[in-house]
Regions:
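Alpha-helix N-cap/helix-start capping motif
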Residues: 7-8, 26-27, 47, 53, ...
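Glycine-rich loops and low-complexity Gly/Arg-rich segments
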Residues: 1-3, 25-29, 46-49, 112-114, ...
Length: 180
């Protein structure tokens, strides 16, 4: 486990540490993505090569191979230390196009959902369900449902399981205010 010295040092620290797994928030991924796209677009025919590479990588992923993306986008992977194979993110929504681009580079991406009161993960996608526009399915022993969904399926997320907060430690008054 390693922690960066600060925002301005993240890329330098990643090259030094060479992580295989990177846990971050969507905003950081979007910033990295913008820099990657800008760098690729600055090259002659960079955008066309990027589109071709994405297409070839997606075909490879459909057949269970991530190596095509890793080879085609090796230069990008090297900026993250060269060994990055998995990014785990959550805490806010991630642009599905950003998720797709990282996945086509041969990097798996797990997007999760949770709350402080649920210690914190409730749902996450995984090897079998790696969607770019979803936080996946509930973890084992967790039940989740959309309460009173509207016509579009939008409603409040209700969660039940052993990881849900039982109350505030030694503070029954505060507990009574939030849990009925």
């Amino acid at each position: 486990i390693s922690f960066s010295r600060g925002l301005r040092y993240i890329m330098q620290d990643m090259k030094e540490v060479q992580p295989t797994i990177f846990v971050t928030v969507p905003l950081m991924l979007e910033k990295f993505h913008a820099r990657i796209v800008k760098k690729i677009s600055a090259k002659t025919a960079g955008s066309a090569i990027f589109k071709f590479g994405k297409s070839a990588s997606m075909v490879g992923r459909a057949f269970g191979s991530k190596s095509i993306g890793r080879k085609l986008f090796n230069e990008v992977i090297e900026t993250f230390g060269g060994k990055l194979r998995l990014i785990v993110t959550g805490a806010s929504a991630l642009d599905p196009r950003v998720a797709e681009d990282f996945m086509t580079m041969g990097i798996d991406l797990y997007i999760g959902y949770g709350l402080t009161e649920t210690s914190p993960i409730v749902m996450v996608n995984n090897d079998r369900l790696m969607l770019t526009d979803s936080v996946g399915t509930p973890l084992p022993n967790i039940e989740a449902k959309i309460h009173n969904p509207d016509d579009l399926g939008v409603g409040e997320i209700w969660v039940r399981g052993p990881m849900v907060m039982q109350g505030y430690y030694k503070n029954p008054e505060a507990t009574a205010e939030v849990i009925t």
